[in-house]
Amino acid sequence: MTATNNIVNLYQPFLDYALTKLKEELELQPYPIPSGFEHKVAMTGKGKKQQEVQTTSYAHCSPKLRQIRAAHVQGGSALQVLNFVIFPHLNYDLPFFGADLVSLPGGHLIALDMQPLFRDNLQYQKKYTEPIWETFQKHQKYLPWGGDFPEEATPFFSPAFLWTRPQKTELVETRVFEAFKDYLQAYLIFVKQTEQITNSEKLAEIKEAQLRYLRYRAEKDPARKMLTRFYGHEWTEEYIHGFLFDLERKLALNPA
């Protein structure tokens, strides 16, 4: 397989692994993908530089997880993206599982985390950050801190946030893939161990924290500019608010 083919299909093994693992470990059910968002194709560039860009969406749910969704963007050797996020139901204090994997001609941007509901709460850190700290340190040795990151985003990422910019595709295929597997496996352990929250005050805090996270992500989505260029403003905004970060829409239809 050539280097170009490696880049073109770079994140398919990640997606295949995650979906297979989740189906093995959880009672998965289909999660509705709004019409028009399952698969979208656009052509970019001109002449010999013309390139097809495909965006494919995947979505499931389980008894404890409200939405498990992936957006897989394939644009040849110029662009490969996998955005894989898990949103818990509002009656669990689980963090979000977040994987943003982006590959461009100049290198790779990798973000893996258990994104916390209550980042600065020490009990929450003890419950959801300490158990993965050793895993984080193991992978950070080979995947060092990627540098500049928006300060305003800090509340939405844990101390075990793996943010790195590897230059070599081989590192993505090996070290990043192993980190992805380890973080997902750790998350599944959290899911199995977590118990339903019944305290009304705590439930209100969870709902507020989830909405705060989703509003920030929807407003600051780094893929907005790229998707708008490929598919237009209207499609992109509806994709972001109606699928990628859809909690407010869902609550409007069925208030919790």
Swiss-Prot record:
What domain of life does the native source organism fall in? Bacteria
Q: Which UniProt keywords apply?
A: Oxidoreductase
**Any one GO molecular function term:** cobalt ion binding
EC class (word): oxidoreductase
Which Gene3D superfamilies does the entry mention?
3.40.1500.20
Under catalytic activity, the entry for this protein gives: (3Z)-phycoerythrobilin + oxidized 2[4Fe-4S]-[ferredoxin] = 15,16-dihydrobiliverdin + reduced 2[4Fe-4S]-[ferredoxin] + 2 H(+)
Question: EC number(s)?
Answer: 1.3.7.3
Question: Which GO biological process annotations does it have?
Answer: phytochromobilin biosynthetic process
Q: Name one Pfam family in it.
A: Fe_bilin_red
Protein family: Belongs to the HY2 family.
Cited function: Catalyzes the two-electron reduction of the C2 and C3(1) diene system of 15,16-dihydrobiliverdin.
Q: What is this protein called?
A: Phycoerythrobilin:ferredoxin oxidoreductase
